[in-house]
Structures are given as structure tokens and as C-alpha cells.
A protein has these predicted regions:
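Mixed-charge, low-complexity intrinsically disordered regions
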Residues: 2-63, 74-212
Length: 212
């Protein structure tokens, strides 16, 4: 009986390893070459990640990104969020809810998502919540009346990598490796690790889906 149980356990482990190492990479490479799922400007990337929930425990976190810039191996992503209305906080961080994540996977092509400049979000009056809708944003971005989903838009999508250290730190925020996305279906960030030149992070996040 113990031998049979051991054989079953080994078989399950082998099947799981085969699925992760052979089947999933094959399906990813097949999908990434189709027009609906290939990486390009404007693509939406869905990713489930493990993160801290504010205490010592971990939880699943759900992220939706929009590709706003591609330069060589640098792929800049912007987080899709929903502006809060009134005193109701929709999202306290960059992740979204499991329910919204599932819904947007099915209908994101029909949802109005507005690109808002960084200055309009953060560069105005002090004491204002940058993630809360107000009359200024409604006047400048009328599409927000239809849907409060938005992303932080990049005004200059062809700017070179800056030389100033502080500007470089800001530049490499949410910049990921194009090769890792296409070849492995992974989000691997480019970071400045106390060095003048960027390097790839050791942290790897899995991509669920790319949609165009």
C-alpha cells in the first residue's frame, strides 16, 4: 500500500513538473504570437502575485497593467486603477479586487480606460487625494463620466534614459524586461541596485494573460 501511494505521489509530481516546464511554456509561446495576445503598445497584462496583506501573512494580489512604452528590452507598464468617488475608497493600493480582476479579464476591451497625466494626478493642490475623482478631472477628461478606470499616462513615450540619478530612479519605475515577457511569460523588473546601470531583479512574477 505504501509503495502504491509513493508511486501515485511521484506520478503527480512528475505530471505537475511536466505541465509547468513543458506544457505551459509551449502554450504561452503559441499564444504570444497571435494578434490577440502578442506584446505591443496598449496591451493589457493581467498578473496574480503574492504579497503582504499588512500583517505577517501573505495573500493573493491582482494587478492589471497597460503597456505605455516599449524601448529595446524596456517595457513600461501603468497600473489600471479606479478613481474613488466621494469618501468611498475603491482601491487602497495598486492591486485590484479579485472580482474586478475577473470581470475585466472578460470585458476590458469594452471598458473605457482613461490615460491621465502624472501632473494632473499629483501636481495640483496639496491635501487632495490623487486617486479621487473631482470636477477638475471630470472637466479635463470627460470620459471619466462614463468610467472611472484610468492609468497614469506617459507624455513622452520616446524619451531617452535620463542621466540624473533621481530622474533615473523615477524612469525605471514599473519598467520590465521585454524578453522575459515574450519568452517566459514573466514580469522581471529592471532596477537600479545602487549601481549606475540598471539590472534585472531577482523577483519574478507570473503573467496570466495579455490582451489587445
Amino acid at each position: 500500500m505504501k509503495k502504491i501511494l509513493l508511486v501515485v505521489i511521484v506520478a503527480v509530481i512528475a505530471l505537475y513538473a511536466f505541465k509547468r516546464m513543458v506544457v505551459e511554456p509551449y502554450l504561452w509561446k503559441k499564444a504570444i504570437n497571435t494578434p490577440e495576445h502578442q506584446l505591443q503598445m496598449g496591451s493589457f497584462i493581467f498578473s496574480q502575485q503574492r504579497g503582504h496583506n499588512g500583517s505577517q501573512s501573505m495573500e493573493n494580489q491582482y494587478f492589471i497593467f497597460k503597456v505605455t512604452e516599449i524601448q529595446g528590452d524596456f517595457v513600461r507598464l501603468a497600473v489600471i486603477r479606479k478613481l474613488s468617488a466621494g469618501d468611498q475608497i475603491v482601491q487602497g493600493d495598486f492591486s485590484t479586487t479579485k472580482k474586478a480582476y475577473g470581470e475585466l479579464k472578460g470585458n476590458i476591451k469594452s471598458v473605457v480606460i482613461t490615460g491621465i497625466s502624472r501632473n494632473d494626478l499629483y501636481g495640483r493642490r496639496t491635501g487632495r487625494d490623487p486617486h479621487q475623482i473631482d470636477e477638475y478631472l471630470l472637466q479635463k477628461y470627460p470620459a471619466l463620466k462614463t468610467s472611472r478606470y484610468y492609468f497614469e499616462d506617459v507624455p513622452d513615450k520616446t524619451r531617452p534614459v535620463p542621466q540624473d540619478p533621481m530622474d533615473r530612479m523615477e524612469y525605471f519605475s514599473l519598467v520590465y524586461s521585454k524578453k522575459a515577457i515574450i519568452e517566459h511569460g514573466r514580469l522581471v523588473a529592471w532596477i537600479l541596485n545602487n549601481r549606475p546601470e540598471p539590472e534585472l531583479s531577482n523577483r519574478v512574477e507570473t503573467i496570466d494573460l495579455i490582451l489587445n
